[in-house]
Amino acid sequence: MALTWTHKDRGEIRVHENLEELSIDLVDYIAEISEASIKEHGAFCIVLSGGSLISFMGKLIEPPYDKIVDWAKWYVFWADERVVAKNHDDSNYKLAKDNLLSKVNVFPRHICSINDTVSAEEAATEYEFAIRQMVRSRTVAASDNSDSPRFDLILLGMGSDGHVASLFPNHPALEVKDDWVTFLTDSHKPPPERITFTLPVINSAANVVVVATGESKANAIHLAIDDLPLPDSSLSLPARLVHPSNGNLIWFMDKQAGSKLDRFKFSE
C-alpha cells in the first residue's frame, strides 16, 4: 500500500513499497486521465519521456488496459529527445515505439516526434512549429493563462542530479521563457545534442507526473519536495521548478527514492 500525502506547494506524493506497486498505480492513473480527457474534449494528449518510465508503463499493453484505453484518441509527444536517428538505441522515440506504441492501436499520424535528419536547433524549431500547428487546429489545448500548450498529461522521469526532461541543473535552458522547445548541444549526459520542452510548457500542463526510483534519487527527491531553508541549492534544481500553474502535480516513487523525505522518515 502506497504512503500518500499532499504537500501544500509540491503536489501529491505517492511512496510505493516496490516497483510493481508503482507500475500498477501509474498505469491506473494514466488510464484514468486518458478517459477523463477524452470525455472532456475528445482526445488525450500525452507527453512521454525516456529512461525507465516507459518500462513502468508496460502494463498498458496488458489486459484490461489494452482493451479499455481508447488508443485511437491518443496523441503522443515527447518532453525531450536525443538528436539521433529514430532507430538509434539512444532515441526516446525508439524506446517508446519498441516497448509501447507498436503494441497498441495509436494512429501513426497521432505520434509527433522530431525530425532526426537536421541539427538540434532545427529539430527544436520544427518540433515547436508542429505543436503550434496542433494548438491552432485545437488538437492540443491552449493554456488559458500563458502562451503555451496545455497538454493533458506530461510524464517526467528524474535524474539523480534532479534533472527532468533535458533540463539540467544550472543550464541556460532553464531560463528559456519565450520558446516552447529549446535545444542543447552540451547535455550533461550523453548524447550531447537534445531538444527539450521548456519549463513554461511543462508548467502549463493539466497534469504532470514525476517518476523517481532507487536510492540514488533520494537526495534529489528531498531537495525537490521538502521545505528547506533559503537560500538553498534546490532553487536551481529543475525538479523543484516543476510547478504547474493551473494543474496537478503527482510524484510517484519507491521507498528507496523517498527515503530522505521528511514525512517518510517520520512515518517510518
From Swiss-Prot:
One of its GO terms (biological process) is carbohydrate metabolic process. It comes from the Eukaryota. Keywords: Cytoplasm, Hydrolase. Disruption phenotype: No visible phenotype under normal growth conditions. Belongs to the glucosamine/galactosamine-6-phosphate isomerase family. 6-phosphogluconolactonase subfamily. It is an enzyme of class 3 (hydrolase). One of its GO terms (cellular component) is cytosol. It catalyses: 6-phospho-D-glucono-1,5-lactone + H2O = 6-phospho-D-gluconate + H(+). The gene is PGL1. It comes from Arabidopsis thaliana. Catalyzes the hydrolysis of 6-phosphogluconolactone to 6-phosphogluconate. CDD domains: 6PGL. Pfam families: Glucosamine_iso. The lineage of its organism: Eukaryota, Viridiplantae, Streptophyta, Embryophyta, Tracheophyta. Pathway: Carbohydrate degradation; pentose phosphate pathway; D-ribulose 5-phosphate from D-glucose 6-phosphate (oxidative stage): step 2/3. Its EC number is 3.1.1.31. This is Probable 6-phosphogluconolactonase 1.
